[in-house]
Amino acid sequence: YIICDIMKIAIISVSKKGYELSLLLKEHLDKDSTIINTDIYYKDVKNTFKLLFYEYDAIIAIMASGILIRSIAPLIKSKVCDPAILNIDENANFVISTLSGHLGGANKLTSKVANMLNATEVITTATDVNKKLGVDVIAKDLYLTVKNPKEIVYFNKAILNNEEIIFRVNSKENYDFLFDYLNENTLEIDVSIEFTSSINTDEIHVLYKNHKLIMKIEDIVVGIGCRRGKSKEDILTGLDKALDDLNISKKRLSKLASGEIKKEETGILDLSKMLNIPVNFVEMDKLTLFKSEDIHESEFVKSKFGVGSVSEASALITAGFDSKLIYKKTAFDGVTIALAVSKKD
């Protein structure tokens, strides 16, 4: 199960006041580069939930909690696959994380939406209320696939009980992104690191007593579009802002990507050298043929280069089959940045 940020959101409301709130909320969410698409639905709640439940990463329900619970009860399957569900009253007093707080990202989205609406966030998951990080939150923050998510509960219980958990990594690979994250975020958790040569370099194993959680490191690809002559510093300014929005370290990046028309662009080549990560220049034919509902095409780019998207499409193509955008195309003074995460299995 790949854990990554919420990208596609549906907002459902039942009253006129709730609908007006959904329009306001969509306005806020559309300005957020980490939210790829937001759609609005009104009334016919039960049928709408049936149709949407597994089509979106998150569903925000502006309605009484009783209506919400009765509507979603028959649809809930598992914390591994259920979408994030948020509940907001029509006066926007409270934003409640209702389902899939960690794995689905409801807690994180609740904080974001509450901030947008100047509302009170309501989060009830035990690790959060005790100011501790769950292992599923660590995986989510670092864009790791959890291979055996049923084990998560044992690790989060251990963390709540102040018991030690061990992160085991391959001794031949660089995991600075993990070490930096643990140093900065796990002051309340008893954590140690073990090195071995016996596990795959793209895996992190987390150990507690006789339990083992396997996390796979997915590729994070930066798609770049830019005007001719933009320097590596110009591109880096945009990239730094995107990484700050996503709370990702440069050390977590796997590849850069752009269209082959940019293969001699000094700024991109220099940035690749500086970050010490490869760059993939995608053939223009592939960019032209590539279709994804995530892509936000530009008529200007299409008129100039014959393709509707460079940064988003090159990131998704380079990240591979079933990859997802985690940062939609955003312009930074002649530079466009998009990020995609792979799904290797």
Language-model features: locations:
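Long, charged alpha-helical interface segments
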Residues: 156-157, 161-173, 177-185, 295-315, ...
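Amphipathic, soluble alpha/beta structural segments
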Residues: 328-345
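C-terminal non-catalytic interaction/assembly regions of soluble proteins
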Residues: 240, 252, 257-313, 319-324, ...
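Extreme N-terminal starter segment of soluble prokaryotic enzymes
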Residues: 6-11
